[in-house]
UniProtKB/Swiss-Prot annotation:
Family classification: Belongs to the XseB family.
Catalyzed reactions per annotation: Exonucleolytic cleavage in either 5'- to 3'- or 3'- to 5'-direction to yield nucleoside 5'-phosphates
Keywords: Cytoplasm, Exonuclease, Hydrolase, Nuclease
EC identifiers of the protein: 3.1.11.6
Subcellular locations according to the entry: Cytoplasm
Cysteine pairings via disulfide bonds: none
Quaternary organization: Heterooligomer composed of large and small subunits.
Molecular function via GO: exodeoxyribonuclease VII activity
The protein's name: Exodeoxyribonuclease 7 small subunit
First-listed, main subcellular location of the protein, grouped into a coarse class: cytoplasm
Domain of life: Bacteria
Cellular component per GO, a single term: exodeoxyribonuclease VII complex
Amino acid sequence: MAVKKPENLSFEAAIEELDSVVNQLESGDLPLEDALKKFERGISLARAGQEKLTQAEQRVEILLQADDNAELTPFDGQDD
């Protein structure tokens, strides 16, 4: 089975795979070359996930701007 490009995965699938990659890297059982490949894949998955979140945030802002009565507050992306 071919590995999908991160940008072609759903957000949920990318996060699930990223979680798996992190677990494999944290185990410390991978040979160096395999660990580097997993790390590269993890970076790609994280970037794709961040891009999907950014796109979703922009869509929400556009939808809220369409409602003239809605109060817009900037999204800071940080938990309290």
